[in-house]
Amino acid sequence: MVVATALCTVALSGCVAPAPDDAAYESKAASTAQAALSEARTALLGVRTRADDRLPSTYLEPVLVDAEQALGEIRTTFDSVQPPPTRAADKLRGTLDPLLESAASDATELRIAARRERPGALGTAADDLAGIADELERFAQEHGT
């Protein structure tokens, strides 16, 4: 997980330059959505594995912390990209940025629920994150090449 997060961060750190046109920005947005999707699915896998009693709670917490941090970094990196001055770029950003924010927030809720050992809250947060993950997947598919 740590290696995946590091690779994701390194891969996305190259996305800080301005996007010269809509196609480049759309490509960066699709890559960002895919990276966020990967982190969200990792967190959800940890929660499901814990719910099946196949993962100790002491391991779930670091999995969730790593996903939470990675999602925050992914969002920060995407937000640092200067979009081209077009309505299409603004619309793309307006669609993806709230998804990234929700994914990061849901990952935080997962971590809090796991630390407090509240299975009901953990399940609710997992359902919320699963919905956002599905939206991230649709976004990545729609805008990927």
Name the predicted role of every residue range.
Residues 15-19:
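Bacterial signal peptide processing site
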Residues 28-108, 121-124, 128-142:
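Alpha-helical segments in soluble extracytoplasmic regions
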Residues 109-118:
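Membrane-helix boundary connector in multi-pass membrane proteins
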Residues 10-14:
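C-terminal motif of bacterial Sec signal peptides marking the signal peptidase cleavage site
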